[in-house]
Amino acid sequence: MNYVMVTGPMGAGKSTLIRSLPEKGVFAPPPDVPEMFLDNACSCRGLQFYEIDEPTALGRHWAGWLGAANAFLLVADAGASPAAVEPLLARLGSACPGTPCLLVANRWPGSRHDAWQLPGVAAVEPLSPGAVLDEERALVQPEEVERILARLQQLLEAA
């Protein structure tokens, strides 16, 4: 069973991405981690997804949850500078060297994404703004979710 920790700055689109996953099932917590209330967690196609916000991921108390991840899905707002995720990326890299990180640049304006290819990032996927449900919720386009799931599988197989 592979665990994918979805993390990133507040408001970057982590919950939107998890909400948009197809065929969601029940989350099975990894063994030997402390109990934690997760904002979002589910299984999808053999992957266990769980969301941990940036402030929690930067802390030391929940390090077991970082170590349980077989891959990181770092969601960033494309309107922000890549520097906005560098402290979190450094924390993930120091806590879990060798764990692949897929950076998803959300709300992508359609330009080149070379600037987002940061040290410690195995791959970058742009993500369009998606469909707005209401003022607080949106959904990612299904074909983009499929592309992200395929890229995650590739990274996990290569690890």
Regions found by a protein language model. Give the residues of each.
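Conserved G1/Walker A P-loop phosphate-binding module
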Residues: 1-32, 41-48
